[in-house]
Amino acid sequence: MKEKVVLAYSGGLDTSVILKWLCEKGFDVIAYVANVGQKDDFDAIKEKALKTGASKVYVEDLRREFVTDYIFTALLGNAMYEGRYLLGTAIARPLIAKRQVEIAEKEGAQYVAHGATGKGNDQVRFELTYAALNPNLKVISPWKDPEFLAKFKGRTDLINYAMEKGIPIKVSKKRPYSEDENLMHISHEAGKLEDPAYIPDEDVFTWTVSPKDAPDEETLLEIHFENGIPVKVVNLKDGTEKTDPLELFEYLNEVGAKNGVGRLDMVENRFIGIKSRGVYETPGATILWIAHRDLEGITMDKEVMHLRDMLAPKFAELIYNGFWFSPEMEFLLAAFRKAQENVTGKVTVSIYKGNVMPVARYSPYSLYNPELSSMDVEGGFNATDSKGFINIHALRLKVHQLVKKGYQK
């Protein structure tokens, strides 16, 4: 009996060649296609996998789970890698790999396989998830396999092999970029973008309009949260209302994209040590992250917020590096969920030509006291108390300066 392998399959050149290669090595290949919001023809991908040699094909719609259990979870900690990247690709990978493991267990497969390269982050994200969820599964990673690397030294070898084996391929020179698309974002890498000094042409961007070409009228959205989770979006101009998590997120993508929101061009540090340039479009999540952070401003205790903010970079790093299923992630999420218990309320944001600006916020758990904050009303705050407060905090500064002067004599 042939040994079974579940292959994470996209329908592209690499994974199609890998599928056929695995078949020729004697494996019973089960292809698994994850729908996380990319604009693909999934029926065509399924047909291609079967024609290429897969014994069975799973096409899994993971979009809702992606929003509720992954994007919204990352939002709890305001996850941003290196202070800028909203982690659209990194957040999707553990979900894709988790479902792959579940299918392998259901099918009694001994192996899982993926088509991630040996230079990138995705190989780590996939394989750490496999290890965390089922250590008994064996991993086939062709782009780290000496036999595969000897046979396929580049894209030309892949194309020649595909043609020889009758694998349908689409080789286009129209978009010379490596792109990853899901519900949260689309990323653009490689090609001319590998030169960090190169200014991208407008045709790089496929989701968002240029901010300068966005509408001349602002869009006002009211975004409602419960315990830090988005539960409703209302367009205050046309009355559109969304409460279903998937529809809510798709609507934010739509509004953000047409208003030029969410573009990012950065050089980031990959986990394996290589620097990489990425151009990202993340419209909906950008709106959510800004609105969520604003609501925290009136609902979170100062010290809790500051402590969470200290942990947020580590949270983002764990996601980026592939440690979604890890003890340290469980620890952080428990703390973040506790910190979000009163992050309930609504924020109004003005969206205009690439900008997202909070203009109003309300929460039944607001810690903002208008009388205490007022410049005109004393509100029970004794201003003379500030004198002692300042003296206490100034004490160590005075001592430091006196000692410093003493050393200088």
UniProtKB/Swiss-Prot annotation:
L-citrulline binds at residues 85, 121, 125, 178, 187, 268, 280. It catalyses: L-citrulline + L-aspartate + ATP = 2-(N(omega)-L-arginino)succinate + AMP + diphosphate + H(+). Transmembrane segments: none annotated. Pathway: Amino-acid biosynthesis; L-arginine biosynthesis; L-arginine from L-ornithine and carbamoyl phosphate: step 2/3. It is found in: Cytoplasm. Gene3D superfamilies: Argininosuccinate synthetase, chain A, domain 2, HUPs, Single helix bin. GO terms for biological process: argininosuccinate metabolic process; L-arginine biosynthetic process; urea cycle. ATP binds at residues 8-16, 34, 115. It comes from the Bacteria. GO terms for cellular component: cytoplasm. InterPro entries: Arginosuc_syn_C (IPR048268), Arginosuc_syn_N (IPR048267), Arginosuc_synth (IPR001518), Arginosuc_synth_CS (IPR018223), Arginosuc_synth_type_1_subfam (IPR023434), AS_cat/multimer_dom_body (IPR024074), Rossmann-like_a/b/a_fold (IPR014729). L-aspartate binds at residues 117, 121-122. Keywords: Amino-acid biosynthesis, Arginine biosynthesis, ATP-binding, Cytoplasm, Ligase, Nucleotide-binding. GO terms for molecular function: argininosuccinate synthase activity; ATP binding. Its EC number is 6.3.4.5. Homotetramer. PANTHER family: ARGININOSUCCINATE SYNTHASE (PTHR11587:SF2). NCBIfam families: argG, PRK00509.1. Belongs to the argininosuccinate synthase family. Type 1 subfamily. This is Argininosuccinate synthase. It comes from Thermotoga petrophila (strain ATCC BAA-488 / DSM 13995 / JCM 10881 / RKU-1).
